[in-house]
C-alpha cells in the first residue's frame, strides 16, 4: 500500500526529492521514467522540496507512490496546485495502474477530473457515505439515482452551477429511501 498525502509538507525538507522518490524499493531508472511521464524535467531529482512549485511537489508525491509498486494506492487530494494537463496525466497514471489489476482510492473534491478516471464514485455528505454510483452515470443526470449526487452533478460549471441550500440538501437526504442525514 502507498499513500499520496494531501500536504506537500510530507516531503522531507532536508533530502533531495529524487532520493525520497527512490526510497527503499525504487531505482533511479524507474524514478526518471516516472518523472518524465509527470513532466518533471531533468534536474528536479537533485532539488530540495523548497525549490519546487506546489504543482511540482504534488507530482513528486504521486511519483513516490507510483514507484513503490504498491497494489493499492490511497491518493488524498493529489492534484490541487497542478496545471490541468499535469493533473490529467497523474490521474491517468492511476487509471493505468487500475487497468493492470491494481487499485487506487482517489479522494478528491474535483468531481470533473474523478469521473473520467474512476470506475465508481462514492459521495459523502457531512462525513457520511450517502451514495456509490458508477462513474459513467455522470454522463447523464437521469442515471444518477440519489438526489444529492444529482445536485453535485448540477453544481458543476458545465451544468450552470446550480446552488442548493443546506436545507435543500438535507431534504434530498431525507427523501431518498435508506438515507437519513441523522445516522
Map each language-model feature to its residues:
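Q-loop/switch helix immediately C-terminal to the Walker
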Residues: 6-7, 13-27
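A short, proline-enriched helix->beta-strand linker immediately N-terminal to the Walker B motif
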Residues: 67-71
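Short catalytic/signature loops enriched in Gly
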Residues: 134-183
